[in-house]
Amino acid sequence: MVLEKIIKMVAEQFMIDENEITADTSFMDDLGADSLDVVELTMALEETFSLPDTPEDELTNIHTVGDLADYVSRATQE
């Protein structure tokens, strides 16, 4: 469920088809994102999932869509 929502948001932000995105999709290598893109997406997810502010050390560990889904899943359980 979390992964599907994130895939939809990533597809909207990067204007690509949802079917082109998997958990293994790399923000930088596959989508051409930079760190600011990841921060913007994370901020949108914080709002969508009512998450606290994402610590900077967590952001440095988010490289793929799956990494982001794992973080959101952990954060929503806390």
Model-found features: residue ranges?
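Phosphopantetheine-dependent thiolation modules in NRPS/PKS and related acyl-activating systems
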Residues: 1-33, 42-43, 47-78
